[in-house]
């Protein structure tokens, strides 16, 4: 081929030939060195550099040393193609006749006949270990001359044809390394070796980059459509041979015109390459699924493959960065044939070759490349180095594609049949992609890419990949996720909005104040009202007595003051704790309802961190009162029928549902009345269904006592004193499951005390005495606060008490040890005696309706099903079995078997028991089938042996 070089020197001169000979020695030993500047050749001398990851701990297959010789032999002709010489312009593309371009556009780039389907997943190291049998030393056919419009395109074709040859002849790891380097610059020719997964990825990459571009001329898109459609109509009228005959003069015309705008292409191509690098670099390490779709095309003769690749790269003239990206992004996933049509548009449309614009785009691309280079060091650096080499080499070596053009012109005659075949296959493959509109495909691609990125960012692991998670850490994380996603607390919107209660009682309060002053003056008591506080249900007048006035002088006037004020009832608090005044509480004309919604929204309730927080109501000053069951720790609620006990229990339960997670708080509900607590069935907080049977309630209280003992054994074993410390150690050391708090609520104690007073009192006393530290809290309500129901043992161990309206002072003293509850107004009016407080506080309790309870409970039920710790039927059976079983039963059975006779008198004498117990033992043996029935005065027969007794 030396005559071609001599012939080409007539056009290029001696300086280009010298530059060619300087770069040629570096091209022979290795493939890649032809296409990169000399400053970076050392990086590519050793192919292993492509397999070195930052940590160097990955094991890759060793590439055979002999591949260089084979490469040299197979790629000698392509390696001579690119020469370092001044680059002519890409202007010939704008001068070609459109019909000629349309004819030859359909002659190469033959994708597979099947639609792209990513079916096979490659190994991250070996890729597809398929080595198709391909003729290695097939000389290049003249088909390469069909579509060679530009020298820059010829350079790209050379690179890709070399890459395809290497892929067919050498290990997959080597092919992967070079494909990673070259693919960002030559997306069009990778149809030869990459399936639809790669194409789709590039399509979405370019679409995303295109969507981010602020300004792109709208005029580019209109001719683009027309350019796509017209070749489709004209192609069938030209046979393959005719197209091949027309192509050589066209390519010669291009070659003759290539010397027009060298500097113009030199300005454009760096920007285009940099922007391709910027667009495709983020996806380099996320190569999509490969497939063997193109096996037929890969096994084609080498001449056909090179012709196709050259034809594909001929469709990539050096246009402006914007236009180039636009076309690549729009057509990358459809077929290489559709990309050929873009060349027609570029010939007709004015190209954006302004030097200013190209330099700005280049600067912007370099900035983006530097920023994106930081995350992964060595691999990305190698990639960027290779990209830079490809850019510079493409600018320097482009004139040599002119030589290749002339060479391929002389070889044209031998490739007509193969080119015709490729042409027909292209036509079949390219028809469907052209039918669809390209623009609608761009936007969905961008949207799908953004959706995938957002989904990947959301699904990303919360733990860094280089952090080793221990088993206990994983367990802790799973528990936290379960707690975070398992239970959603009810919304305040489930509660009714209270109606507006606007009432001006200023005149009434002033009138009552004057009447009170007048009454005290009439009874010669030197005292006057100094302050008035209006609450939801009562108004408190603070009376300050003058020095020397006894307090009982005012308290003894209770009935007289009630008479003068015309009040239903008054309560005198003398003195008010912490003040030097006496409080006289007078009922309001109309009471205000305290809704649970305003209590839940109060800062006192929301800021409380305890899961056992419960809202009680408003005090006389209108401030919300919130209690913590951990500090109570047990409560006694008593009052007459209709005074508000059950409503108070409901508000406490609903407050717990708003504050407590089922994994933190468990509730045991005992409702002998059967209807008060029935709405709370099947909530996840329950340890068992709501217990309504008195016998089951007794068994449940015994279970609570056993649970308390079990927890204290755990605490003693762990060396802790309370449940909070135990749960803390459990979370830190993963010793076991956390212990939840257990709240036991008994709605009617009087009924239980009638059924089994001893067992119930004993269980309640034991729970109240020592269950606080193990997280078990007791709430007991009764409507009959008499001494036989609230015994001294129970009252002494329950420090917190809530008294509603009662009928007598005796009942009031039974509940709160002082009088005063008999003067309450009812309907939620209560006296709250807190643990450690000397005097009770008057509160107006919350009100929660049945509709609100149903809404909250239905929400809680929807979160998760309940997990019961026991079933009440099982407890009842266990309790009855314990009662029926006699501790002497087994010994009596042994005695009967040994004596071989059974009688009541013998058992009485042997075990020194009474007749009743002995007769019961005999009856139990008969029921078990151990002895026969009675035979009058004769002793019973024994029906079992000693071995049977042991087996039983």
From Swiss-Prot:
SUPFAM superfamilies: P-loop containing nucleoside triphosphate hydrolases (SSF52540), Winged helix' DNA-binding domain (SSF46785)
Note: StfA and SpoIIIE are not functionally redundant. They probably play distinct roles during growth and sporulation.
Organism whose genome encodes this protein: Bacillus subtilis (strain 168)
Protein name: DNA translocase SftA
Gene that produces this protein: sftA
Comp. bias intervals (Basic and acidic residues): 33-49, 93-104, 134-169, 200-215, 278-287, 310-329, 343-358, 391-413, 424-452
Binding-site residues for ATP, renumbered to this chain: 639-646
GO CC, any one term: cytoplasm
GO annotation terms (biological process): cell division; chromosome segregation
Pfam families, per the entry: FtsK_alpha (PF17854), FtsK_gamma (PF09397), FtsK_SpoIIIE (PF01580)
Domain FtsK: 622-813
Alphabetized InterPro entries for the sequence: AAA+_ATPase, FtsK/SpoIIIE/SftA, FtsK_alpha, FtsK_dom, Ftsk_gamma, P-loop_NTPase, WH-like_DNA-bd_sf, WH_DNA-bd_sf
Domain of life of the organism encoding this protein: Bacteria
Composition-biased stretches (Polar residues): 414-423
Any GO MF annotation of the entry: ATP binding
Assembly: Homohexamer.
Stretch list, region Disordered: 15-468
UniProt keyword annotation of Transcription regulation present: no
Null allele phenotype: Delay in chromosome segregation and an increase in the sensitivity to agents that induce DNA damage. They divide over unsegregated chromosomes with increased frequencies. A cell filamentation phenotype can also be seen, when associated with a noc deletion.
Segments of skewed composition (Low complexity): 237-250
